[in-house]
Amino acid sequence: MSKEPQTGVDGQINMPIFPLRTVLFPGGILPLRIFEPRYVDMIRWCMREQATFGVVLLRQGSEVNTPAGAAGNDRELFKIGTEAEIIDFNQADNGLLGIVAQGRRKFSIVDTNEKKDGLLLASVQYLPEEAVGELTDEHETLVTVLKDLLQHPLIQQLNPEVDLQQARSVSYRLADLLPLEPEIKQALLQMNWPKERLSELRRLVGKFRG
């Protein structure tokens, strides 16, 4: 279990940021293959210190190394991300570092500092934990869709945690597992209420079904 990140002023938390074209939800499972030296160093530091890091969606720019001051360094991030805890790791034969991270709490970026190698360090503020919420009959279709997704062999390998009785858990896992564009997933992540997220998911699932 990871220890608590270092707390700064006004309850802000300091953590390294991993910008990706992927959205991580609380409780979600994220396998990663790490090859860039800056992120290899970051992950090894996190494992050594039992620290967490932040996953934030790239609004624009590249995941690939663009050091500060380099031409084309136009990286821009969304402000809301998710704290990630490393729950497994391995060293592949090709030298790549493989990890499995699990989403914990949502946060908002207050400020960032970019190192010379392009690694982002951020001061973040945790967002209030969402209410668990209750499911109703109108959510029955969404629960069925989620159950079907959980039977997929690739998803079973990830073994995501889900409580099919909780609105928050169902909304997070559906948003996580449905094949949606990253920006749509980001909009779902930024919602503060499970019922609001479930309502939007009902609309999206309805579009899938024509």
Question: What function would you assign to each model-found segment?
Answer:
Residues 1-160, 169, 183, 187, ...:
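Positively charged
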Residues 163-180:
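Core structural elements
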Residues 187-188, 195:
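Charged low-complexity "KEKE/polyampholyte" interaction tracts
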Residues 194-195, 207:
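A short structural micro-motif
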